[in-house]
Amino acid sequence: PPTKLPRVVTVYDCWALLNPAQCSSITNDAMKALRRAIQTEAVVHASSHATAATLRELFPTARIEIIYLGAPERRSASSRKTRPDALSAMGDAPFIVAIGTVEKRKNYPRLVEAFALAAHENSDLQLVIAGSAGDDSDLLQQAVDSLSPKMAERVHLIGRVTDDNIGWLYQQAAAMAYPSLDEGFGFPLLEAMSANLPIVGSTLGSIPEVSGTAAILVDPFDVSALAEALTNVVTNSELRIKLQSAGATQFQSFSWEKTAQQLVNLYNDLVN
């Protein structure tokens, strides 16, 4: 309802604002409400510089404040980690993991193509994609089906997994792939860093600013470059150590205490 009180809206990413045809009616209704709030002078809290840049294009007169989100809690060595049942036959083969709902922006079909190229040079390497079904599930399955039978057997689409499963995947993977076409922040990047996991990421969205130097960044539309990066991250031990060290440092840059204090400062500024 209309109010003269100061208002703050938080925007984590702009995918739904930019791609309404790929969103549900509920999501699009929420985006209409968000637009109204911003157009009636609500202050916008953006979770990254990338998100803020897009918002400035959409809402040139809006006041936008950039406040990063915090890092996920580190999983302790004693925390429960369970192998997903769907991977029981994979044995101890090395694998690259990608975690997230199967949405178009996750770019999973190209990841499968790139993996197939990289896997020709790494005979036992596997790819595990863990995430709920989404608007790109059919194209992802088509990408897997287009591979040779032997190569397709090395791609594991395991669907939604439990938190214990995620802990196991991060602990056991050789690397994480995050070739998204857009991300407003990217919690999986920080989760991978907390697990000391090397990352292959995309040059788009917030991925460069959140990952810092803890990831190999490539054009997500360039399948060959993505394949080369996947190969390098699993075969080059010196590179892996460099990425792991950078990740440990980068992870320390994010904390919920810092996020909370910056939000409190923003709220105080608005009411005073």
What residues fall within each predicted segment?
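Carbohydrate transferase catalytic cores enriched for Leloir-type hexosyltransferases
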Residues: 1-272
